[in-house]
Protein backbone atom coordinates (compact mmCIF):
# COMPACT_ATOMS: atom_id res chain seq x y z
CA UNK A 1 0.00 0.00 0.00
CA UNK A 2 1.11 3.59 -0.48
CA UNK A 3 2.40 4.72 2.89
CA UNK A 4 -0.10 7.04 4.56
CA UNK A 5 1.02 10.11 6.48
CA UNK A 6 -1.71 10.23 9.13
CA UNK A 7 -4.59 8.07 10.31
CA UNK A 8 -6.85 10.29 8.21
CA UNK A 9 -5.03 8.95 5.16
CA UNK A 10 -5.60 5.40 6.43
CA UNK A 11 -9.34 6.07 6.70
CA UNK A 12 -9.39 7.73 3.28
CA UNK A 13 -7.91 4.61 1.72
CA UNK A 14 -10.50 2.41 3.44
CA UNK A 15 -13.56 4.50 2.58
CA UNK A 16 -12.58 4.56 -1.11
CA UNK A 17 -11.44 0.92 -1.34
CA UNK A 18 -12.83 -1.33 -4.06
CA UNK A 19 -14.70 -3.57 -3.48
CA UNK A 20 -16.24 -1.51 -0.73
CA UNK A 21 -15.57 -2.75 2.82
CA UNK A 22 -17.92 -2.27 5.74
CA UNK A 23 -18.22 -2.17 9.52
CA UNK A 24 -20.25 -5.03 11.02
CA UNK A 25 -22.05 -4.83 14.34
CA UNK A 26 -21.86 -8.49 15.44
CA UNK A 27 -22.80 -7.94 19.08
CA UNK A 28 -25.49 -10.07 20.74
CA UNK A 29 -26.32 -12.07 17.63
CA UNK A 30 -26.52 -9.06 15.32
CA UNK A 31 -25.05 -8.80 11.84
CA UNK A 32 -25.70 -5.17 10.93
CA UNK A 33 -23.48 -3.93 8.12
CA UNK A 34 -22.49 -0.30 7.65
CA UNK A 35 -20.97 0.18 4.17
CA UNK A 36 -17.87 2.36 3.94
CA UNK A 37 -19.66 5.36 2.34
CA UNK A 38 -22.24 5.34 5.15
CA UNK A 39 -19.50 5.03 7.79
CA UNK A 40 -17.70 7.99 6.17
CA UNK A 41 -20.94 9.98 6.19
CA UNK A 42 -21.36 9.34 9.91
CA UNK A 43 -17.73 10.27 10.64
CA UNK A 44 -18.09 13.55 8.76
CA UNK A 45 -21.46 14.33 10.36
CA UNK A 46 -20.15 13.69 13.86
CA UNK A 47 -16.97 15.68 13.22
CA UNK A 48 -19.08 18.65 12.14
CA UNK A 49 -21.29 18.26 15.21
CA UNK A 50 -18.28 18.17 17.53
CA UNK A 51 -16.72 21.15 15.77
CA UNK A 52 -19.93 23.12 16.34
CA UNK A 53 -19.45 22.49 20.07
CA UNK A 54 -15.97 23.96 19.87
CA UNK A 55 -13.90 20.77 19.73
CA UNK A 56 -10.81 21.45 17.66
CA UNK A 57 -7.12 20.82 17.18
CA UNK A 58 -5.28 19.85 20.34
CA UNK A 59 -8.42 19.01 22.33
CA UNK A 60 -9.13 15.64 23.93
CA UNK A 61 -12.34 13.61 23.67
CA UNK A 62 -12.85 10.57 25.91
CA UNK A 63 -14.58 7.37 24.72
CA UNK A 64 -15.96 4.95 27.30
CA UNK A 65 -17.41 2.11 25.28
CA UNK A 66 -17.06 -1.53 24.35
CA UNK A 67 -16.20 -2.67 20.84
CA UNK A 68 -18.80 -1.56 18.27
CA UNK A 69 -18.80 0.38 14.97
CA UNK A 70 -19.50 3.64 16.81
CA UNK A 71 -16.14 3.31 18.56
CA UNK A 72 -14.27 3.89 15.31
CA UNK A 73 -16.81 6.41 14.05
CA UNK A 74 -16.10 8.55 17.13
CA UNK A 75 -12.37 7.84 16.83
CA UNK A 76 -12.07 9.00 13.23
CA UNK A 77 -14.41 11.98 13.77
CA UNK A 78 -12.18 13.21 16.60
CA UNK A 79 -9.00 12.62 14.58
CA UNK A 80 -10.34 14.56 11.59
CA UNK A 81 -10.64 17.62 13.84
CA UNK A 82 -6.99 17.37 14.85
CA UNK A 83 -8.09 16.38 18.35
CA UNK A 84 -6.97 13.30 20.27
CA UNK A 85 -9.17 10.64 21.78
CA UNK A 86 -8.83 9.20 25.26
CA UNK A 87 -10.10 5.61 25.40
CA UNK A 88 -11.51 4.52 28.76
CA UNK A 89 -12.15 0.86 29.60
CA UNK A 90 -15.86 0.29 30.35
CA UNK A 91 -14.80 -1.95 33.25
CA UNK A 92 -13.22 0.93 35.19
CA UNK A 93 -14.78 2.19 38.40
CA UNK A 94 -16.00 5.81 38.77
CA UNK A 95 -12.89 6.91 40.69
CA UNK A 96 -10.68 5.49 37.92
CA UNK A 97 -12.78 7.26 35.28
CA UNK A 98 -12.48 10.50 37.26
CA UNK A 99 -8.69 10.23 37.37
CA UNK A 100 -8.44 9.80 33.60
CA UNK A 101 -10.91 12.55 32.70
CA UNK A 102 -9.30 15.00 35.12
CA UNK A 103 -5.71 14.24 34.10
CA UNK A 104 -6.40 14.28 30.36
CA UNK A 105 -8.46 17.47 30.44
CA UNK A 106 -11.02 15.94 28.08
CA UNK A 107 -13.51 18.53 26.78
CA UNK A 108 -16.10 15.95 25.77
CA UNK A 109 -16.96 12.42 26.84
CA UNK A 110 -18.77 9.80 24.75
CA UNK A 111 -20.49 7.16 26.94
CA UNK A 112 -21.84 3.97 25.40
CA UNK A 113 -24.93 3.37 27.53
CA UNK A 114 -26.72 4.50 30.71
CA UNK A 115 -24.37 2.44 32.92
CA UNK A 116 -21.30 4.22 31.56
CA UNK A 117 -23.14 7.54 31.56
CA UNK A 118 -23.87 7.13 35.28
CA UNK A 119 -20.12 6.89 35.99
CA UNK A 120 -19.43 10.03 33.96
CA UNK A 121 -22.21 12.04 35.61
CA UNK A 122 -21.05 10.90 39.06
CA UNK A 123 -17.56 12.33 38.53
CA UNK A 124 -18.32 15.22 36.17
CA UNK A 125 -18.30 17.78 38.98
CA UNK A 126 -14.63 17.08 39.70
CA UNK A 127 -13.62 17.22 36.02
CA UNK A 128 -13.92 20.93 35.16
CA UNK A 129 -12.64 20.56 31.59
CA UNK A 130 -15.60 18.36 30.59
CA UNK A 131 -18.08 20.59 28.74
CA UNK A 132 -20.12 18.03 26.81
CA UNK A 133 -21.35 14.51 27.58
CA UNK A 134 -22.65 12.39 24.70
CA UNK A 135 -24.67 9.16 24.99
CA UNK A 136 -24.56 6.48 22.27
CA UNK A 137 -27.47 4.22 23.34
CA UNK A 138 -30.52 5.14 25.39
CA UNK A 139 -32.49 8.23 26.30
CA UNK A 140 -30.33 11.18 27.29
CA UNK A 141 -31.21 13.08 30.49
CA UNK A 142 -31.10 16.85 30.62
CA UNK A 143 -27.64 18.24 29.91
CA UNK A 144 -26.57 15.19 27.89
CA UNK A 145 -26.61 14.93 24.09
CA UNK A 146 -27.17 11.77 22.07
CA UNK A 147 -24.69 10.70 19.42
CA UNK A 148 -27.45 10.49 16.83
CA UNK A 149 -28.66 14.04 17.50
CA UNK A 150 -25.13 15.43 17.46
CA UNK A 151 -24.30 13.78 14.13
CA UNK A 152 -25.23 16.21 11.38
CA UNK A 153 -26.98 14.94 8.26
CA UNK A 154 -24.62 15.18 5.29
CA UNK A 155 -24.72 13.68 1.82
CA UNK A 156 -22.10 11.19 0.70
CA UNK A 157 -20.52 13.79 -1.60
CA UNK A 158 -20.45 16.46 1.11
CA UNK A 159 -18.98 13.96 3.56
CA UNK A 160 -16.19 13.02 1.17
CA UNK A 161 -15.40 16.69 0.50
CA UNK A 162 -15.39 17.53 4.21
CA UNK A 163 -13.10 14.63 5.12
CA UNK A 164 -10.71 15.50 2.28
CA UNK A 165 -10.56 19.11 3.46
CA UNK A 166 -9.56 17.94 6.95
CA UNK A 167 -6.58 15.87 5.79
CA UNK A 168 -4.01 18.63 5.14
CA UNK A 169 -4.80 20.29 8.48
CA UNK A 170 -3.63 17.27 10.50
CA UNK A 171 0.10 16.61 10.71
CA UNK A 172 2.00 13.37 11.30
CA UNK A 173 3.40 14.60 14.63
CA UNK A 174 -0.01 15.67 15.97
CA UNK A 175 -1.22 13.83 19.05
CA UNK A 176 -3.66 11.05 18.09
CA UNK A 177 -4.45 9.55 21.47
CA UNK A 178 -3.79 9.46 25.18
CA UNK A 179 -3.92 5.84 26.31
CA UNK A 180 -3.86 5.35 30.05
CA UNK A 181 -1.90 2.23 30.88
CA UNK A 182 -3.99 -0.28 32.78
CA UNK A 183 -0.88 -1.06 34.80
CA UNK A 184 -0.13 -4.21 36.78
CA UNK A 185 1.69 -1.93 39.21
CA UNK A 186 1.70 1.75 40.05
CA UNK A 187 -0.45 4.70 38.98
CA UNK A 188 -1.82 4.72 35.41
CA UNK A 189 -0.06 7.18 33.12
CA UNK A 190 -1.34 8.78 29.91
CA UNK A 191 0.79 7.56 27.00
CA UNK A 192 1.03 10.14 24.21
CA UNK A 193 0.93 8.51 20.77
CA UNK A 194 1.01 10.53 17.56
CA UNK A 195 -0.37 9.83 14.10
CA UNK A 196 3.17 8.97 13.04
CA UNK A 197 3.57 6.47 15.89
CA UNK A 198 0.49 4.55 14.75
CA UNK A 199 1.08 4.88 11.00
CA UNK A 200 4.72 3.82 11.22
CA UNK A 201 3.93 0.83 13.43
CA UNK A 202 0.95 -0.24 11.31
CA UNK A 203 2.82 -0.01 8.01
CA UNK A 204 5.91 -1.73 9.40
CA UNK A 205 3.98 -4.58 11.05
CA UNK A 206 1.81 -5.04 7.96
CA UNK A 207 4.88 -5.33 5.74
CA UNK A 208 6.13 -8.56 7.32
CA UNK A 209 2.96 -10.65 7.27
CA UNK A 210 0.60 -11.82 4.51
CA UNK A 211 -2.40 -9.79 5.68
CA UNK A 212 -5.51 -10.76 3.71
CA UNK A 213 -6.98 -7.90 1.69
CA UNK A 214 -10.70 -7.23 1.16
CA UNK A 215 -11.74 -9.94 3.63
CA UNK A 216 -13.18 -9.89 7.17
CA UNK A 217 -11.54 -9.38 10.57
CA UNK A 218 -13.14 -9.65 14.00
CA UNK A 219 -12.37 -7.26 16.87
CA UNK A 220 -13.18 -8.53 20.35
CA UNK A 221 -10.21 -7.38 22.44
CA UNK A 222 -11.01 -3.97 23.95
CA UNK A 223 -10.36 -1.18 21.45
CA UNK A 224 -9.30 0.82 24.50
CA UNK A 225 -6.21 -1.40 24.49
CA UNK A 226 -3.41 -0.38 22.14
CA UNK A 227 -3.02 -3.82 20.53
CA UNK A 228 -6.55 -4.08 19.11
CA UNK A 229 -6.39 -0.38 18.27
CA UNK A 230 -3.21 -0.70 16.20
CA UNK A 231 -4.32 -3.92 14.50
CA UNK A 232 -7.66 -2.30 13.62
CA UNK A 233 -5.78 0.44 11.77
CA UNK A 234 -4.00 -2.28 9.78
CA UNK A 235 -7.42 -3.74 8.94
CA UNK A 236 -8.51 -0.32 7.67
CA UNK A 237 -5.28 0.09 5.70
CA UNK A 238 -5.84 -3.30 4.05
CA UNK A 239 -9.45 -2.55 3.10
CA UNK A 240 -10.91 -5.25 5.36
CA UNK A 241 -14.46 -5.47 6.61
CA UNK A 242 -14.32 -5.17 10.40
CA UNK A 243 -16.78 -6.93 12.70
CA UNK A 244 -17.16 -6.11 16.39
CA UNK A 245 -18.35 -8.12 19.38
CA UNK A 246 -17.81 -8.36 23.12
CA UNK A 247 -15.18 -10.74 24.43
CA UNK A 248 -17.84 -12.92 26.10
CA UNK A 249 -19.63 -13.35 22.74
CA UNK A 250 -16.57 -14.42 20.81
CA UNK A 251 -17.50 -18.09 20.35
CA UNK A 252 -20.83 -17.29 18.72
CA UNK A 253 -19.43 -14.44 16.62
CA UNK A 254 -16.56 -16.57 15.28
CA UNK A 255 -19.04 -19.12 13.94
CA UNK A 256 -21.40 -16.52 12.46
CA UNK A 257 -18.91 -14.05 10.99
CA UNK A 258 -16.23 -16.62 10.08
CA UNK A 259 -13.38 -14.08 10.09
CA UNK A 260 -10.16 -14.52 8.16
CA UNK A 261 -8.21 -12.84 10.94
CA UNK A 262 -8.40 -11.83 14.60
CA UNK A 263 -6.11 -10.84 17.44
CA UNK A 264 -6.31 -12.22 20.97
CA UNK A 265 -4.42 -12.44 24.23
CA UNK A 266 -2.84 -15.79 25.23
CA UNK A 267 -5.57 -16.50 27.77
CA UNK A 268 -8.09 -16.74 24.91
CA UNK A 269 -6.05 -19.45 23.17
CA UNK A 270 -5.46 -21.23 26.50
CA UNK A 271 -9.21 -21.27 27.21
CA UNK A 272 -9.98 -22.73 23.77
CA UNK A 273 -7.23 -25.31 24.26
CA UNK A 274 -8.52 -26.26 27.72
CA UNK A 275 -12.11 -26.54 26.48
CA UNK A 276 -11.10 -28.84 23.62
CA UNK A 277 -9.16 -31.17 25.89
CA UNK A 278 -11.83 -31.09 28.61
CA UNK A 279 -14.58 -32.06 26.15
CA UNK A 280 -12.46 -34.86 24.73
CA UNK A 281 -11.69 -36.19 28.21
CA UNK A 282 -15.36 -37.14 28.61
CA UNK A 283 -15.78 -38.49 25.06
CA UNK A 284 -16.15 -42.22 24.24
CA UNK A 285 -12.95 -44.26 24.32
CA UNK A 286 -12.63 -44.59 20.52
CA UNK A 287 -13.01 -40.85 20.01
CA UNK A 288 -10.42 -40.16 22.72
CA UNK A 289 -8.01 -42.59 21.08
CA UNK A 290 -8.41 -40.93 17.67
CA UNK A 291 -7.91 -37.50 19.21
CA UNK A 292 -4.76 -38.53 21.09
CA UNK A 293 -3.28 -39.91 17.89
CA UNK A 294 -4.31 -36.77 16.00
CA UNK A 295 -2.56 -34.56 18.57
CA UNK A 296 0.59 -36.69 18.31
CA UNK A 297 0.60 -36.32 14.51
CA UNK A 298 -0.10 -32.57 14.75
CA UNK A 299 2.80 -31.95 17.13
CA UNK A 300 5.11 -34.12 15.03
CA UNK A 301 4.24 -31.99 11.98
CA UNK A 302 5.32 -28.85 13.85
CA UNK A 303 8.69 -30.35 14.76
CA UNK A 304 9.37 -31.82 11.31
CA UNK A 305 7.88 -28.96 9.30
CA UNK A 306 6.08 -31.50 7.08
CA UNK A 307 2.46 -32.59 6.74
CA UNK A 308 2.16 -36.09 5.32
CA UNK A 309 -0.69 -38.49 4.66
CA UNK A 310 -1.41 -39.03 8.36
CA UNK A 311 -1.77 -35.30 8.91
CA UNK A 312 -4.17 -35.01 5.95
CA UNK A 313 -6.24 -37.91 7.29
CA UNK A 314 -6.55 -36.37 10.74
CA UNK A 315 -7.27 -33.01 9.15
CA UNK A 316 -10.46 -34.52 7.75
CA UNK A 317 -11.32 -36.37 10.97
CA UNK A 318 -10.26 -33.87 13.65
CA UNK A 319 -8.38 -30.66 12.78
CA UNK A 320 -10.93 -29.22 10.35
CA UNK A 321 -13.67 -29.63 12.96
CA UNK A 322 -11.64 -27.70 15.53
CA UNK A 323 -10.92 -24.96 12.98
CA UNK A 324 -14.64 -24.78 12.22
CA UNK A 325 -15.22 -23.75 15.84
CA UNK A 326 -13.26 -20.54 15.14
CA UNK A 327 -14.97 -19.93 11.81
CA UNK A 328 -13.01 -22.23 9.53
CA UNK A 329 -11.43 -19.46 7.44
CA UNK A 330 -8.47 -18.40 9.59
CA UNK A 331 -5.13 -18.35 7.82
CA UNK A 332 -3.36 -17.17 10.95
CA UNK A 333 -4.12 -15.21 14.09
CA UNK A 334 -2.12 -12.93 16.34
CA UNK A 335 -1.31 -13.20 20.03
CA UNK A 336 0.03 -10.41 22.20
CA UNK A 337 -0.19 -8.77 25.58
CA UNK A 338 1.42 -11.63 27.53
CA UNK A 339 3.52 -14.75 26.85
CA UNK A 340 1.83 -17.52 24.84
CA UNK A 341 2.57 -20.96 26.35
CA UNK A 342 4.67 -22.95 23.87
CA UNK A 343 2.48 -26.05 24.11
CA UNK A 344 -0.59 -24.01 23.19
CA UNK A 345 1.17 -22.45 20.19
CA UNK A 346 2.39 -25.86 19.02
CA UNK A 347 -1.09 -27.36 19.26
CA UNK A 348 -2.75 -24.65 17.17
CA UNK A 349 0.08 -24.62 14.64
CA UNK A 350 -0.21 -28.39 14.38
CA UNK A 351 -3.93 -28.32 13.58
CA UNK A 352 -3.52 -25.64 10.92
CA UNK A 353 -4.08 -22.38 12.82
CA UNK A 354 -0.77 -20.56 13.06
CA UNK A 355 -0.77 -18.21 16.06
CA UNK A 356 1.88 -15.55 15.51
CA UNK A 357 3.13 -14.18 18.79
CA UNK A 358 4.38 -10.62 18.95
CA UNK A 359 5.63 -8.22 21.59
CA UNK A 360 5.23 -4.60 22.47
CA UNK A 361 3.87 -2.09 24.95
CA UNK A 362 1.43 0.79 24.96
CA UNK A 363 4.47 3.09 24.92
CA UNK A 364 5.68 1.54 21.64
CA UNK A 365 2.43 1.82 19.64
CA UNK A 366 2.70 -1.23 20.44
CA UNK A 367 4.51 -3.60 18.07
CA UNK A 368 8.26 -4.10 18.54
CA UNK A 369 8.67 -7.67 17.33
CA UNK A 370 6.50 -10.35 15.75
CA UNK A 371 6.97 -13.86 14.45
CA UNK A 372 6.92 -14.15 10.68
CA UNK A 373 4.41 -16.34 8.87
CA UNK A 374 7.12 -18.22 6.95
CA UNK A 375 9.61 -18.65 9.82
CA UNK A 376 7.87 -18.64 13.21
CA UNK A 377 9.84 -19.73 16.24
CA UNK A 378 7.52 -20.83 19.02
CA UNK A 379 8.58 -19.74 22.48
CA UNK A 380 9.85 -16.42 21.17
CA UNK A 381 8.09 -13.15 20.33
CA UNK A 382 9.75 -13.06 16.93
CA UNK A 383 11.99 -10.59 15.14
CA UNK A 384 11.93 -6.80 15.12
CA UNK A 385 9.70 -5.17 12.53
CA UNK A 386 11.44 -2.93 9.94
CA UNK A 387 12.70 0.38 11.33
CA UNK A 388 12.73 -0.79 14.95
CA UNK A 389 15.91 -1.25 17.00
CA UNK A 390 16.22 -3.56 20.00
CA UNK A 391 19.15 -4.20 22.33
CA UNK A 392 19.57 -5.87 25.70
CA UNK A 393 20.95 -3.79 28.59
CA UNK A 394 23.60 -5.10 30.97
CA UNK A 395 20.92 -6.12 33.49
CA UNK A 396 18.92 -7.97 30.83
CA UNK A 397 16.29 -5.28 30.24
CA UNK A 398 14.93 -4.95 26.70
CA UNK A 399 15.55 -1.50 25.20
CA UNK A 400 14.03 -0.25 21.95
CA UNK A 401 14.34 2.80 19.68
CA UNK A 402 12.48 4.05 16.63
CA UNK A 403 9.43 5.94 15.33
CA UNK A 404 7.17 3.57 17.27
CA UNK A 405 8.28 5.00 20.64
CA UNK A 406 5.80 7.36 22.35
CA UNK A 407 6.24 11.09 22.64
CA UNK A 408 6.12 10.67 26.43
CA UNK A 409 3.75 10.49 29.38
CA UNK A 410 1.10 13.21 29.58
CA UNK A 411 2.03 15.83 32.19
CA UNK A 412 4.73 13.56 33.63
CA UNK A 413 8.16 14.74 32.41
CA UNK A 414 10.06 12.93 35.17
CA UNK A 415 8.28 9.63 34.50
CA UNK A 416 9.13 10.10 30.82
CA UNK A 417 12.80 10.77 31.59
CA UNK A 418 12.90 7.65 33.76
CA UNK A 419 12.19 5.39 30.76
CA UNK A 420 13.31 7.38 27.70
CA UNK A 421 16.93 8.51 27.44
CA UNK A 422 18.43 11.36 25.42
CA UNK A 423 19.45 8.97 22.62
CA UNK A 424 15.85 7.81 22.15
CA UNK A 425 16.17 4.41 23.82
CA UNK A 426 13.02 3.34 25.67
CA UNK A 427 13.38 1.02 28.66
CA UNK A 428 10.58 -1.53 28.41
CA UNK A 429 10.80 -2.91 31.94
CA UNK A 430 10.90 -6.44 30.50
CA UNK A 431 13.78 -8.87 30.88
CA UNK A 432 14.67 -10.68 27.68
CA UNK A 433 17.18 -12.54 25.55
CA UNK A 434 18.06 -11.89 21.91
CA UNK A 435 19.30 -14.83 19.84
CA UNK A 436 22.18 -14.55 17.39
CA UNK A 437 19.71 -14.58 14.49
CA UNK A 438 17.47 -11.89 15.97
CA UNK A 439 14.64 -13.69 17.79
CA UNK A 440 13.57 -12.09 21.06
CA UNK A 441 12.43 -14.07 24.08
CA UNK A 442 10.84 -12.32 27.06
CA UNK A 443 11.58 -14.01 30.37
CA UNK A 444 9.90 -11.73 32.93
CA UNK A 445 8.96 -8.24 34.03
CA UNK A 446 11.86 -6.43 35.71
CA UNK A 447 9.59 -5.25 38.54
CA UNK A 448 8.20 -8.76 39.04
CA UNK A 449 11.56 -10.38 39.74
CA UNK A 450 11.51 -11.79 43.26
CA UNK A 451 14.70 -11.37 45.30
CA UNK A 452 14.64 -13.82 48.19
CA UNK A 453 16.06 -13.12 51.63
CA UNK A 454 19.08 -15.12 50.53
CA UNK A 455 19.68 -12.74 47.61
CA UNK A 456 18.59 -15.17 44.88
CA UNK A 457 16.66 -13.78 41.88
CA UNK A 458 13.53 -15.72 40.91
CA UNK A 459 11.61 -14.98 37.68
CA UNK A 460 8.01 -15.91 38.58
CA UNK A 461 6.20 -15.76 35.24
CA UNK A 462 7.76 -18.86 33.70
CA UNK A 463 6.99 -20.88 36.85
CA UNK A 464 3.43 -19.55 36.95
CA UNK A 465 3.00 -20.52 33.31
CA UNK A 466 4.08 -24.09 34.10
CA UNK A 467 1.50 -24.31 36.90
CA UNK A 468 -1.21 -23.05 34.54
CA UNK A 469 -0.53 -25.88 32.10
CA UNK A 470 -2.54 -28.14 34.42
CA UNK A 471 -6.25 -28.21 33.53
CA UNK A 472 -6.99 -28.02 37.26
CA UNK A 473 -5.28 -24.61 37.56
CA UNK A 474 -7.10 -21.45 36.49
CA UNK A 475 -4.33 -19.09 37.60
CA UNK A 476 -1.26 -18.96 39.81
CA UNK A 477 0.81 -16.18 41.35
CA UNK A 478 4.18 -16.56 43.08
CA UNK A 479 5.43 -14.43 45.95
CA UNK A 480 8.61 -14.37 48.03
CA UNK A 481 10.31 -11.00 47.61
CA UNK A 482 12.68 -10.51 50.60
CA UNK A 483 11.30 -13.73 52.09
CA UNK A 484 13.13 -16.97 52.96
CA UNK A 485 11.30 -19.03 50.32
CA UNK A 486 8.79 -18.91 47.46
CA UNK A 487 5.06 -19.43 48.01
CA UNK A 488 2.12 -19.54 45.60
CA UNK A 489 -1.55 -18.68 45.45
CA UNK A 490 -3.19 -21.21 43.13
CA UNK A 491 -6.66 -20.49 41.74
CA UNK A 492 -8.54 -23.74 41.21
CA UNK A 493 -10.28 -24.23 37.86
CA UNK A 494 -13.67 -25.31 39.20
CA UNK A 495 -14.94 -26.19 35.70
CA UNK A 496 -12.44 -29.03 35.50
CA UNK A 497 -12.02 -29.74 39.21
CA UNK A 498 -15.68 -30.57 39.84
CA UNK A 499 -15.89 -33.31 37.14
CA UNK A 500 -12.50 -34.62 38.34
CA UNK A 501 -13.84 -34.84 41.90
CA UNK A 502 -17.21 -36.35 40.91
CA UNK A 503 -15.41 -39.07 38.99
CA UNK A 504 -13.71 -40.00 42.28
CA UNK A 505 -16.91 -39.85 44.31
CA UNK A 506 -15.98 -36.65 46.16
CA UNK A 507 -18.66 -34.12 47.22
CA UNK A 508 -18.54 -30.92 45.14
CA UNK A 509 -21.42 -28.72 46.30
CA UNK A 510 -19.35 -26.81 48.89
CA UNK A 511 -16.32 -25.12 47.29
CA UNK A 512 -14.39 -24.68 50.52
CA UNK A 513 -15.01 -28.29 51.49
CA UNK A 514 -13.93 -29.42 48.03
CA UNK A 515 -10.66 -27.50 48.21
CA UNK A 516 -9.90 -28.84 51.68
CA UNK A 517 -10.54 -32.45 50.69
CA UNK A 518 -7.29 -34.41 51.18
CA UNK A 519 -7.55 -36.01 47.72
CA UNK A 520 -7.89 -32.58 46.10
CA UNK A 521 -5.02 -31.16 48.16
CA UNK A 522 -2.87 -34.12 47.13
CA UNK A 523 -3.70 -33.56 43.45
CA UNK A 524 -2.57 -29.94 43.60
CA UNK A 525 0.49 -30.87 45.65
CA UNK A 526 1.41 -33.28 42.85
CA UNK A 527 1.10 -30.44 40.31
CA UNK A 528 3.37 -28.21 42.41
CA UNK A 529 5.85 -31.03 43.03
CA UNK A 530 6.01 -31.80 39.32
CA UNK A 531 6.82 -28.15 38.52
CA UNK A 532 9.40 -28.03 41.33
CA UNK A 533 11.32 -30.98 39.83
CA UNK A 534 12.69 -28.76 37.06
CA UNK A 535 13.57 -25.76 39.24
CA UNK A 536 16.65 -24.77 41.17
CA UNK A 537 16.24 -25.29 44.90
CA UNK A 538 15.87 -21.57 45.64
CA UNK A 539 13.11 -21.31 42.98
CA UNK A 540 10.95 -24.13 44.30
CA UNK A 541 7.50 -23.47 45.75
CA UNK A 542 7.65 -24.40 49.42
CA UNK A 543 4.00 -23.71 50.29
CA UNK A 544 0.81 -22.90 48.43
CA UNK A 545 -2.80 -22.02 49.14
CA UNK A 546 -5.79 -22.87 46.98
CA UNK A 547 -8.23 -20.10 46.07
CA UNK A 548 -11.79 -20.90 45.04
CA UNK A 549 -12.65 -17.52 43.53
CA UNK A 550 -11.22 -16.71 40.12
CA UNK A 551 -9.38 -13.43 39.59
CA UNK A 552 -11.40 -10.98 37.49
CA UNK A 553 -11.35 -7.52 35.97
CA UNK A 554 -14.42 -6.54 38.01
CA UNK A 555 -12.76 -7.37 41.32
CA UNK A 556 -9.53 -5.66 40.31
CA UNK A 557 -7.04 -8.54 40.20
CA UNK A 558 -6.81 -8.58 36.38
CA UNK A 559 -6.09 -5.86 33.86
CA UNK A 560 -8.53 -5.49 30.94
CA UNK A 561 -6.19 -7.75 28.95
CA UNK A 562 -6.33 -10.43 31.68
CA UNK A 563 -2.85 -9.92 33.13
CA UNK A 564 -2.59 -10.43 36.88
CA UNK A 565 -2.13 -7.30 38.99
CA UNK A 566 0.42 -8.85 41.31
CA UNK A 567 0.36 -6.02 43.85
CA UNK A 568 -3.45 -6.03 44.07
CA UNK A 569 -3.47 -9.79 44.67
CA UNK A 570 -0.70 -9.43 47.24
CA UNK A 571 -2.64 -6.79 49.16
CA UNK A 572 -5.96 -8.65 48.97
CA UNK A 573 -4.50 -11.92 50.23
CA UNK A 574 -1.86 -10.48 52.57
CA UNK A 575 -3.13 -12.48 55.56
CA UNK A 576 -3.05 -15.72 53.57
CA UNK A 577 0.47 -14.96 52.35
CA UNK A 578 1.63 -14.02 55.84
CA UNK A 579 0.30 -17.32 57.18
CA UNK A 580 2.62 -19.24 54.86
CA UNK A 581 5.62 -17.63 56.55
CA UNK A 582 4.41 -17.90 60.14
CA UNK A 583 3.13 -21.49 60.21
CA UNK A 584 4.63 -24.86 59.70
CA UNK A 585 4.12 -26.27 56.21
CA UNK A 586 0.39 -26.96 56.43
CA UNK A 587 -2.30 -26.65 53.80
CA UNK A 588 -5.26 -24.31 53.95
CA UNK A 589 -7.82 -23.38 51.30
CA UNK A 590 -9.22 -19.90 50.79
CA UNK A 591 -12.49 -20.61 49.03
Predicted regions and their residues:
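Conserved AMP-binding/adenylate-forming core of the ANL superfamily
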Residues: 3, 22-76, 93-98, 146-155, ...
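ANL superfamily adenylate-forming
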Residues: 28, 115-172, 276-321
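Conserved AMP-binding A3 loop
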Residues: 33-37, 176-202
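Conserved ATP-binding/catalytic segment of the ANL
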Residues: 53, 64, 181, 384-452, ...
